[in-house]
């Protein structure tokens, strides 16, 4: 190696050329007063010493980049890139590489410093030949170029003359941002590398196809450029960064990779970076090495506002300068500097998006105006400042503004300044109190916490952030749903807004739950039973059926036991409850079809209605419910609500009755009956009365009797030849019966034993009728065996008034049900079982023949409390001589709920029962029978005060677990 001479020689030695791999003698000269820094090579060292002309001279000032090349099969290669082309040197080892490369870079840097230009070396430089394909010929970029890569851009530098042999101009140098590259690739066999540009690139949208020296170079270009595009996309990808002192390239934000046009709808993640520099350097686009761009991706669609090519000489500047620019730095300091020349309030950066693209490079608007931020033109929704915390400087910084800053910087303070005077402090406190007092809204459903909680009254930065305005009652509730459930029924104590409920639904208790809590406190167990299948039929046509249910609700108004109801049931539903109010004073409603005379005596203040004298044509179900217009529907209770339950010619007495008077109306062991009359009536108008509870074994024992009964039954001709003795009729007027009520009681007491014996025979006769006799044809009843045990213990004394049991009135639907033949078999057993199940009553309906007189209807009742097995259930029945026909309405066409009949020839019994819950809280405990909270019964006939019957239009009872269907 030659030593450094006086002419400025720095290094010399034998090296290899990259293209030919031949050894040449290279000499590196420094810049002197007479010559420039250069690199020369000779064929041999001898020619160098002989001062022969060098084979080639490369001036370092013409080299825009000197770096190490790694894409060749040689490990130690240094490339000098210039407008004349690239020149590669292959060294022997790493030490020689470092020595020569460092010296070359020092000389290049010295040249740049002497010329006052910035030196920004490229990371990678490839020499390619751009083909006349795609947009290359259109934009004039063809021929040999240097493809130079940085972390931000891809620059093409022309090699050779700027004119083609055809005289066409060539682009000398052009820089393409990596964010405007949609994709890139290579074709190995053909040594082709291509890039697809987006519409925001300086060349516009299109493809650039370039040829490399070999396939390895094309592959290396693809991998290197793709990795540069993929680097650092997660941070600061769509902001353009300009640095005062160029930092390490690895720390500059970069997009991940390019995206195709069909991904234009992807969201943009804009992040603001922090930098220690407080001022920004003015950069010019004329030098392609002193700035960099970063964005997340390129989306190229048909329309655009402009391109960088239209303003290639734009100036990129920071906030210290007022020149026009299409971009600004992403630097936004989070702390306000006292010595800053800009206002204390830093505006957030904005992103400008084209009409059909998710993001685009900032472009000049050609009007000389400058915006601190980019505007989103696509979105129809404006940004909410208070929701973007990062877009605002800290509020504490605004309170740091002092008078010194105002005087030094000649800015009028636009931020709230702390008053230092004590008077100002006092005035401020008074104003705060006035504002606080004005925020008190007297709305019953609005929380009184006011909106003052949104204010920070102790701080001085109330003006830095706009206060969100809430409408009344619309503030966000922070309480959980389960916490709100504890205050469903306590609106006054709940500070939050509560749901509006309709009348009677605030308890949020399902109606079915209300009906299941009617048991006494000492009888806590639930009565669950399967309801027998029943249907409402008319002339053989089925109108509906119900499946087995274990829980149901009844139509009677019941008290709400809140401690037994789950509070979260139906909490989101609105329920309209037509049941009575929970006030015990207003729960005493008695529904009845006919109002007897003695009811008026008990309730003298109750108004009489004309509906008591009306009749119902028992021809269909519609006639029963809708046959007459109910005049008593206009009568409302004291709580102002109209009774919505289906009633007949109902009667609603006054609610201010005494418990003792109501107790007299209970089904008890009445000893009185209306006087027996001999008034004749058509036989087809008689009510056939029978008990039930003939077991399946009893039905099987008498098939021949049932067939005989079936053949002799006058069902087809609607007549019956038997002489009923278990019913009574009267033709006396309503006034006669009310005056002679005491005489009726005496007559009934004398004929009690005779009627019981005769009635027991008729009951057994009717019980022996065969209607199918299936065990599943049982209707559960509402009284338990325990209740009947208590009733039976008190039923031995038939003369006592207050120790009566429950009376059952049974309605038959056909005249053929009563047979002249009596079956005495199983009387004691059947009546004993029947007396344990019969607890409710049904209503008899008067005939039109007796509609002229209010008291022309007749009643019958049966006592199931007798201790005698044969006549236990019928000891208090009233009756007449067998020769006395009864004038009672025939109701075989009534569509009461009943089970389906197994035989067509035999009619069904349509049984209706009424579950009378305990509606009055004033009844003493001594008048209540254990296990049964039923209101006092009311007689169904205006003349007879000894019996009663009511109709419940609900088809089943959840608590009736011990009764069967009437088999008539």
Swiss-Prot record:
User: In the record, which positions carry Phosphoserine?
Assistant: 286-287, 342, 555, 932, 935
Question: What's an example Gene Ontology biological process for this entry?
Answer: positive regulation of immune response
Identify the residue span(s) of motif YXXM motif 1: 411-414
Keyword list, A-Z: Differentiation, Growth regulation, Oogenesis, Phosphoprotein, Repeat
Low complexity composition-biased segments: 956-968
Q: Name one GO molecular function term.
A: insulin receptor binding
Q: What does the record say mutating residue 744 to S does?
A: In strain: FSP3, FSP15, FSP16, FSP23, FSP25, FSP29, RR8, RR11, RR17, RR33, RR35, RR52, S108, T9, T15, T28, T39 and T41
Biased-composition ranges, Basic and acidic residues, are 697-711
For region Disordered, the annotated ranges are: 248-269, 304-370, 528-555, 697-739, 922-968
Q: What is this protein called?
A: Insulin receptor substrate 1
The record's gene field reads: chico
């Amino acid at each position: 190696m030659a030593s450094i001479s006086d002419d400025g020689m720095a290094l010399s030695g034998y090296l290899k050329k990259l293209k030919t791999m031949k050894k040449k003698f290279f000499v590196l000269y420094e810049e002197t007063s007479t010559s420039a820094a250069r690199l020369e090579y000779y064929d041999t060292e001898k020619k160098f010493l002989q001062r022969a002309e060098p084979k080639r001279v490369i001036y370092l000032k013409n080299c825009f980049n000197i770096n190490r090349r790694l894409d060749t099969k040689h490990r130690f290669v240094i490339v000098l890139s210039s407008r004349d082309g690239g020149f590669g040197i292959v060294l022997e080892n790493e030490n020689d590489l470092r020595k020569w490369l460092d010296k070359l870079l020092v000389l290049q840097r010295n040249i740049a410093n002497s010329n006052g230009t910035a030196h920004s070396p490229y990371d990678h430089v490839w020499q390619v030949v751009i083909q006349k394909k795609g947009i290359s010929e259109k934009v004039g970029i063809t021929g040999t170029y240097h493809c130079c890569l940085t972390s931000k851009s891809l620059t093409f530098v022309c090699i050779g003359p700027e004119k083609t042999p055809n005289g066409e101009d060539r682009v000398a140098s052009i820089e393409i941002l990596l964010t405007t590259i949609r994709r890139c690739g290579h074709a190995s066999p053909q040594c082709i590398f291509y890039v697809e540009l987006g519409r925001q690139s300086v060349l516009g949208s299109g493809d650039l196809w370039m040829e490399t020296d070999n396939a390895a170079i094309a592959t290396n270009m693809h991998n290197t450029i793709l990795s540069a595009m993929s680097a650092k996309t997660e941070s600061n990808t769509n902001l353009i960064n300009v640095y005062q002192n160029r930092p390490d390239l690895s720390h500059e934000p970069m997009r991940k990779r390019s995206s195709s046009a069909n991904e234009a709808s992807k969201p943009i993640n804009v992040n603001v970076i922090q930098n220690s520099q407080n001022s920004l350097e003015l950069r010019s686009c004329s030098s392609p090495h002193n700035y960099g761009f970063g964005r997340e991706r390129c989306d190229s669609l048909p329309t655009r506002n402009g391109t960088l090519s239209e303003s290639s000489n734009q100036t990129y500047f920071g906030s210290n300068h007022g020149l026009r620019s299409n971009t600004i730095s992403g630097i936004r300091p989070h702390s306000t500097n006292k010595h800053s020349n800009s206002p204390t309030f830093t505006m957030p950066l904005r992103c400008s998006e084209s009409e059909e693209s998710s993001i685009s490079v900032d472009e000049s608007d050609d009007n000389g105006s400058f915006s601190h931020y980019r505007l989103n033109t696509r979105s129809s929704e404006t940004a909410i400042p208070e929701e973007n915390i990062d877009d605002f400087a800290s509020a504490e910084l605004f309170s740091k503004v002092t008078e010194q800053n105002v005087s030094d910087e000649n800015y009028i303070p636009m931020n709230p300044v702390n008053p230092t005077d004590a008077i100002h402090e006092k005035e401020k406190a008074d104003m705060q109190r006035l504002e606080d007092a004005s925020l008190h809204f007297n709305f019953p459903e609005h929380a009184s916490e006011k909106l003052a909680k949104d204010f920070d009254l102790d701080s001085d930065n109330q003006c830095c952030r706009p206060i969100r305005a809430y409408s009344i009652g619309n503030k966000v509730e922070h309480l959980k749903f389960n916490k709100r459930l504890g205050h469903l029924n306590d609106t006054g104590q709940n500070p939050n807004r509560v749901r509006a409920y309709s009348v009677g639904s605030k308890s949020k208790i399902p109606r079915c739950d209300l009906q299941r809590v009617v048991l006494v406190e000492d009888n806590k167990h639930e009565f669950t039973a399967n309801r027998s299948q029943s249907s409402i039929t008319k002339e053989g046509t089925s109108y509906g059926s119900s499946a087995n249910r274990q829980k149901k609700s009844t139509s009677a108004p019941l008290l709400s036991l809140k401690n037994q109801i789950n509070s979260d049931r139906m909490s989101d539903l609105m329920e309209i409850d037509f049941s009575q109010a929970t006030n015990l004073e207003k729960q005493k409603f008695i529904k009845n079809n006919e109002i007897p005379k003695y009811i008026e005596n008990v309730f003298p203040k109750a108004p009489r209605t004309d509906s008591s004298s009306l009749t119902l044509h028992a021809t269909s179900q519609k006639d029963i419910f809708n046959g007459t217009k109910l005049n008593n529907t206009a009568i409302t209770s004291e709580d102002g609500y109209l009774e919505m339950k289906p009633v007949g010619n109902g009667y609603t007495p006054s609610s201010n009755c005494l418990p003792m008077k109501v107790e007299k109306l209970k089904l008890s062991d009445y000893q009185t009956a209306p006087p027996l009359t001999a008034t004749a009536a058509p036989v087809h108008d008689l009510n056939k009365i029978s008990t039930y509870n003939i077991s399946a074994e009893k039905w099987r024992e008498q098939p021949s009797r049932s067939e005989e009964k079936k053949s002799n039954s006058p069902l087809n001709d609607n007549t019956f030849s038997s002489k009923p003795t278990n019913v009574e009729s009267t033709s006396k007027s309503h006034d006669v019966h009310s005056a002679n009520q005491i005489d009726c009681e005496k007559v009934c007491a004398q004929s009690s034993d005779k009627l019981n014996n005769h009635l027991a025979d008729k009951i057994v006769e009717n019980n022996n009728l065969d209607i199918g006799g299936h065990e599943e044809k049982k209707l559960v009843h509402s009284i338990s065996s325990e209740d009947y045990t208590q009733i039976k213990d008190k039923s031995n004394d038939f003369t006592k008034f207050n120790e009566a049991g429950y009376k059952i009135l049974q309605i038959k639907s056909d005249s053929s049900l009563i047979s002249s033949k009596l079956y005495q078999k199983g009387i004691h057993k059947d009546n004993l079982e029947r007396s344990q199940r019969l607890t409710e009553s049904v209503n008899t309906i008067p005939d039109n023949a007796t509609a002229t007189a209010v008291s022309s209807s007749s009643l019958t009742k049966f006592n199931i409390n007798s201790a005698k097995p044969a006549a236990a259930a019928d000891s208090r029945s009233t009756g007449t001589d067998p020769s006395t026909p009864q004038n009672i309405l025939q109701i075989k066409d009534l569509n009461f709920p009943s089970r389906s009949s197994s035989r067509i020839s035999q009619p069904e019994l349509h049984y209706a029962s009424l579950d009378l819950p305990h509606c009055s809280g004033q009844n003493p405990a001594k008048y209540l029978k254990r296990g049964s909270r039923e209101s006092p019964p009311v007689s169904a006939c205006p003349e007879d005060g000894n019996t009663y019957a009511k109709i419940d239009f609900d088809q089943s009872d959840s608590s009736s677990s011990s009764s069967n269907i009437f088999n008539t």
